[in-house]
């Protein structure tokens, strides 16, 4: 046992000595195997085999590839930002003018100093790119400013001028509406002054409501000059409206010459004043002596042929045309004893009796002369 062990030990020592001495000697097959191993390590097939052997887990490589990808992305983003900055900015800005200033510009530049709504919008669109892009969103604003501001006047289109829409122009009194001719600053809101003639006509129209209303034959239409109508004093018998408080019945009439001469005068001649005073005293005594029972109003009481009369009849001048047309008869007219029979026909308001009619009732039993 000792010999074999010693012999084996000597053999092993000899092999080790030889291998150490002949380290540079190429052993048969060792070099080729080493080359094959190196090639297998470098080949991708061997790499995949190693991945399979490790259970599908790939050995992580160096982060050199990911860093290059991040650098590429950063460069592309920088290029995009530079491209955006190099693009020209939008130069369309809203003009600093109000709609009133824009309308005034367009009207002043026109040869006739008047434009339609479409012409105003066309001028604004051609002059300002901002409104050209926003059209027609602002067209209603132009229309409202034209209608609501007194500085713009609407002119109807002429019959021989075909087209659509009315013309608009500037009020001559609104020339100094902008400060120093600058359209950027407006002094104050322009308000058109009401004309004096218009105010006078409005006052006359309001006063004419009532007795002399617009519906009456003597009513004056609004807008016409008062001189176009004949004054009531020029008529033979002024018009008496059927309104107002009533006077005592059976008012005697004055001569037509006196009515014409003293149509609206508050004073009468001395002779007429004496006549009126005597008639008033006579009428007062007659009214006191009248019986309390009065007959009803009827045509027989007005147009009667009875000659019986308690008081001597008193004649007067011919009645107005209105009474003559109502009583078309050639027979003599005899008034009734009742004062209420003739009252509604000859009653007039108190505001028209000055200088025209007597203030008291004096013809309770008067008779008109035959025609």
From Swiss-Prot:
Transmembrane segments: none annotated. Its main location: nucleus. Induction: By dorsal wnt signaling. Inhibited by bmp signaling. Initially located within the dorsal blastopore lip (Spemann organizer) at the mid-gastrula stage. As expression fades in the neuroectoderm, expression begins in the head mesoderm in two regions at the lateral borders of the presumptive neural plate. These regions correspond to neural crest cells originating from the mesencephalon (anterior) and the rhombencephalon (posterior; rhombomeres 2, 4 and 6). Subsequently expressed within trunk premigratory neural crest cells. Residues 1-90 are annotated as: Disordered. One of its GO terms (biological process) is positive regulation of neurogenesis. Residues 1-13, 75-85 have a biased composition (Low complexity). InterPro entries: FH_FOXD3, Fork_head_dom, FOX_domain-containing, TF_fork_head_CS_2, WH-like_DNA-bd_sf, WH_DNA-bd_sf. One of its GO terms (molecular function) is DNA-binding transcription factor activity, RNA polymerase II-specific. It is found in: Nucleus. GO terms for cellular component: nucleus. Residues 94-188 bind DNA. Residues 297-303 are annotated as: tle4-binding. Residues 34-51 have a biased composition (Basic and acidic residues). Disulfide bonds: none annotated. Keywords: Developmental protein, Differentiation, DNA-binding, Neurogenesis, Nucleus, Repressor, Transcription, Transcription regulation. The C-terminus is required for transcriptional repression and mesoderm induction. PANTHER family: FORKHEAD BOX PROTEIN (PTHR11829), FORKHEAD BOX PROTEIN D4-LIKE 1 (PTHR11829:SF361). Transcriptional repressor that is an essential upstream regulator of neural crest determination and mesoderm induction. Functions by recruiting the transcriptional corepressor tle4. Also acts in a negative auto-regulator loop by inhibiting the transcription of its own gene. Interacts with tle4. This is Forkhead box protein D3-B. It comes from Xenopus laevis (African clawed frog).
